[in-house]
Amino acid sequence: MVEAIYRCAKCGREVKIDLSVTRDLRCPYCGSKILYKPRPKVPRRVKAI
């Protein structure tokens, strides 16, 4: 069971999709095919040279 969280570009809702069951990525609320992976809220620190 591989579950991933995506954000719909059209309606803005967060959607949990089980990738082991389906390969069709669509928003179940509005039917949009454009989904984004949300970025983590933790800021990254990059060491400057």
Swiss-Prot record:
SMART domains: RPOLCX. The keyword Nucleotidyltransferase applies. It is an enzyme of class 2 (transferase). GO terms for cellular component: cytoplasm; DNA-directed RNA polymerase complex. Its EC number is 2.7.7.6. Zn(2+) binds at C11, C27, C30. Gene3D superfamilies: RNA polymerase ii, chain L. Keywords: Cytoplasm, DNA-directed RNA polymerase, Metal-binding, Nucleotidyltransferase, Transcription, Transferase, Zinc. It catalyses: RNA(n) + a ribonucleoside 5'-triphosphate = RNA(n+1) + diphosphate. One of its GO terms (biological process) is DNA-templated transcription. It comes from the Archaea. GO terms for molecular function: DNA binding; DNA-directed RNA polymerase activity; zinc ion binding. It is found in: Cytoplasm. Belongs to the archaeal Rpo12/eukaryotic RPC10 RNA polymerase subunit family. Part of the RNA polymerase complex. DNA-dependent RNA polymerase (RNAP) catalyzes the transcription of DNA into RNA using the four ribonucleoside triphosphates as substrates. This is DNA-directed RNA polymerase subunit Rpo12. It comes from Pyrococcus abyssi (strain GE5 / Orsay).
